[in-house]
Amino acid sequence: MRHIISVTLQNEAGALTRVAGLFSTRGYNIESLSVAPTDDPSVSRLTLVTTGSDAVIHQISHQLLKLVDVVGVEDVTREEHFERELLLIKVRAKATQVGSLWSATQRAGGRVLWDAADSFTIELTSSEAEINRFIAEVANFGAVLEVVRCGALAIQKGKKVLES
């Protein structure tokens, strides 16, 4: 099963390496990883997506908490949460399809960052499923030249916060 794990850790050199090392030495795969400082510059928030049984994820969480830099760990998968990814996509549109490309971008809630003749760079923030749908849709309007996307970001709904 796919799991989203949020981790807060001290913003120290080597902290991310130790987290990634924990996964690699145990043979677990990280499907996506996003990390950035929080409102406290000494603490970073890491959001990672991995797969495994509930028992495996529970074990991973306990192992993460043993790392000296880790402050908090939460598997947000089964809790109510918001989850988003960011997509940047470059498309070469056929002249007859430019209007359709603009319409699809607006319907999806995206934004055209660059429009030059037949080349478009589009930004979209949405769920993984919506981003996958959008990529498939715009491929009908021309050639997809480049796709860049960040890993999943997640935050729990309501007042509950991850320890920092």
Model-derived segments and their meaning:
Residues 1-4, 8-44, 49-164:
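Long, contiguous binding/interaction regions
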